[in-house]
Amino acid sequence: VTDAMRATYAPTGVEFAITNSGGLRADLTCPTTDNPSDFCPAYTPPPYPITRGQVLTVLPFGNIVTTVTISGAELKTMLENGVSRMPAVDGRFPQVSGLCFTYDIALLAGSRVLSAFETDSTGNCTATPVDLTATSSYKIAENDFMTGGGDGYPVFSSRATTQDIMDQVTADYITANSPISPFVKAFPDGRINCADSNGAAAPNCPALTASP
């Protein structure tokens, strides 16, 4: 979803995309056993068709993409908010595109983000750092729920630009880029990496598996 947001608005200068996990209500993979109550087509081995109904199951709220230019410090505030409730399961946890970052789950909420780096065209982390200070600025895409302060994210309503409905943005991206992979890489090459400075004494990082 965030890849779709970033790619769609990259021509307008968008560098990163962030959405809250609570807005993603399903995934785009289908079970091997057919279920007439879901939106999956009859099962075939991957790559398999993705239906409009599946996209709407993932994004059922009708959220709209917004774009806004923020400072690096504001971006850090967003990332800090996103991991502030970890290891608890919380809808504010961010899904990102265009950047990868590392946070220390043992540190106090608000001071957990250690570093962030840009990703390349394939989604791999690069050595190019993201400047998380007030002296830098980045244009991002997010959803209108977050823009209005939902899930504790900073309020950017007064300076954000309203774009298109997220489900349509995602559907158009899938159509243009199929076949697509349903997974992103896990630690240590993933977009969001958890460190635990308490080590074995407090193994609170999530399981190191790939995510949809």
Label each region the model flagged:
Residues 1-212:
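Catalytic centers of hydrolytic enzymes
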